[in-house]
Amino acid sequence: WIMGHMVNAIAQIDEFVNLGANSIETDVSFDSSANPEYTYHGVPCDCGRTCTKWEHFNEFLKGLRKATTPGDSKYHEKLVLVVFDLKTDSLYDNQASDAGKKLAKSLLQNYWNNGNNGGRAYIVLSIPNLAHYKLITGFKEALTSEGHPELMDKVGYDFSGNDDIGDVANAYKKAGVTGHVWQSDGITNCLLRGLDRVRKAVANRDSSSGYINKVYYWTVDKRQSTRDALDAGVDGIMTNYPDVIADVLNESAYKAKFRIASYDDNPWETFKN
């Protein structure tokens, strides 16, 4: 999965997919009542990027729905996965469940079209704080009470705080999560970070007792760091330059081993060689 980083304006969906992304990451900010409010990152952000592009969250969802609904004039067949980077650090811990419920209702109405031929992309809820695990249970409760528990089949999870892998496993246990797990590791492109924790996550993914289904690394903008991440065995790379990742995947060393995921590739299944 080539994951376009910080796609917060509707116009950027086309831009990143046209550069080769089959997945996008979108920032979601919340108001003081735990309602998802804007797709907005703010300052500071990655080097070389404008930090302040934004939409109202529900409007962004409508644009995203068009981009992922077959037959729509804005449809992109290859856009198959969306990571919502949930900026819950502005909330109190006891608001996490409410944030999950409100997020689910927004998605149900504006993205999934109340279960009636809505957008088809898989969704990852990426949460920065392990203490906010109830966002997951709240999300699930809301979809169930709204009569659409089947949509949970399209939803996966990530804790994005670079926490100890054992602590992450524990948070999932508390949330009742037993699958659909993506594990992120990374740092802003302004700084360097080694691949030690990525390798631990990959080892967990590949062990019979692991909780991780997929591993992605962020934010990778250079060819050599792309090669290093691929050599470590990641499933996804988040980038400001999807074309750079696509170029490296075309190199002979990687062409035989990796391919760009399509809609038929289940993002919740661990890939077995």
UniProtKB/Swiss-Prot annotation:
Q: Where in the cell is it found?
A: Secreted
- The membrane-spanning stretches of this chain are none
| Alphabetical list of Pfam families matching this protein | GDPD_2
Q: Which reaction does it catalyse?
A: an N-(acyl)-sphingosylphosphocholine = an N-(acyl)-sphingosyl-1,3-cyclic phosphate + choline; an N-(acyl)-sphingosylphosphoethanolamine = an N-(acyl)-sphingosyl-1,3-cyclic phosphate + ethanolamine; a 1-acyl-sn-glycero-3-phosphocholine = a 1-acyl-sn-glycero-2,3-cyclic phosphate + choline; a 1-acyl-sn-glycero-3-phosphoethanolamine = a 1-acyl-sn-glycero-2,3-cyclic phosphate + ethanolamine
**What does UniProt give as the signal peptide span?**
none
What family is it from? Answer: Belongs to the arthropod phospholipase D family. Class II subfamily.
Source domain of life: Eukaryota
Its GO CC terms are: extracellular region
Which InterPro entries does the UniProt entry name for this protein?
Answer: PLC-like_Pdiesterase_TIM-brl
The protein here is known as Dermonecrotic toxin LapSicTox-alphaIB1aiii
Q: What is its EC number?
A: 4.6.1.-
**What positions does the entry give for Mg(2+) binding?**
25, 27, 85
Swiss-Prot/TrEMBL GO biological process terms: killing of cells of another organism; lipid catabolic process
What species was this sequence derived from?
Answer: Loxosceles apachea
Q: Which residues are glycosylated?
A: 250
Q: Name one GO molecular function term.
A: toxin activity
State the active site.
5, 41 (nucleophile)
Major place of residence: secreted
